[in-house]
Amino acid sequence: NLTVDMNYKLQAIISLSAVVVSCGVGVYLAYTGYGVWTLVVQTLLNNMLNVVLLWCCVRWFPLLSFSLKSFKELFNFGSKLLLSGLLETIYTNLYTLVIGKKFSADQVGFYNRAFVFSQLPSYNITFIINRVIYPLLCAQQEKPEILKQHYIHYLRLTCLLIFSLMIGLCCLADPIINIVLTDRWSPAAVLLQLLCIAYMWYPVINFNYLVLNAVGRTDYVLKSEVLKKINSVAVLLLTIPLGIKAMCAGIAVSLLFNVFVGMFFTSKVISLSMREQWKELLPVLTISVSMGIFIYGVGLLIDNAYAKVAIEIPIAVLFV
């Protein structure tokens, strides 16, 4: 209800209250010698407080009754989302499993650091934006023309932000890794660059997913997820023998393929062809790539890692 009503202030207050209390208890338990159980208690307490505070503020409580009609309606919608979510979870963990089995501890560490850095702009910012945009899309599900306008507008804004951040991070990967993690982790820079190119497409994929959910076409969500994972697993199997860099490059290829799949199914629910969607994205992509080329060229003239970051970030901001 709070998300649909766009009451993010109350959600923030509830989340912050739960975090403060649970972290306080966690710190106390850590100092009194509870060890790893501290993390267990802190996580459980945080979730319990969130539930209790939401119940108290929203005044909604579950009833001890079962509605077959509601179950059928929700199952038809939610079961496909559940299956697509399971496919995504299995695939994500498959990469970690393969890397852990096939490569050395050093390479696993380099990949892990590169992966974490690449997620900060793409996944986290997109997740925050989605919480605001999804209710807007749902509110216009009966008005396809307005839904189409919202989709184009917010897609371009989000992609301008994420594309610029990811391409900027790609160009500054080496100095950032050396500054934050020291030069011992410098091999992670190449992996970070490849993953930045891969995950810059995440907001496009996610926006297609949001539109399909907003109009209730979770069958398209599941079909698209099956196609994506078949392609991604095939790419994974082909790149395993070629090394960890090839695997990261394979992720980029897979996610670009996912963009085309998502756009194809989105074009079926709103009057916006794949060509028109790319036409909307092209100016944003051109600006971001031009910025990347420019700051990369500037970086070639600077040797010091700190100076590169200090000079190139303001230039990138002014460029965009």
Question: Where do the language-model regions lie?
Answer:
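Short runs within selected transmembrane alpha-helices of multi-pass transporters and secretion channels
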Residues: 1-3, 14-26, 39-55, 84, ...
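Helix-loop junctions and terminal segments of transmembrane helices
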Residues: 3-4, 62, 114, 118-162, ...
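Interhelical loop/hinge segments that connect adjacent transmembrane helices in multipass membrane
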Residues: 9, 13, 52-97, 107, ...
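Alpha-helical transmembrane segments of multi-pass membrane transport and lipid-handling proteins
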Residues: 24, 28, 32, 126, ...
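Helix-terminus/linker motif at the lipid-water interface of multi-pass membrane proteins
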Residues: 28-30, 89-120, 135-139, 174-184
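Interfacial/gating helices of multi-pass transporter permease domains
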Residues: 36, 73-77, 81, 97-119, ...
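Alpha-helical transmembrane segments of polytopic membrane transporters and translocases
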Residues: 48, 80, 95-97, 109-126, ...
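Transmembrane alpha-helical segments of multi-pass transport proteins
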Residues: 279-320
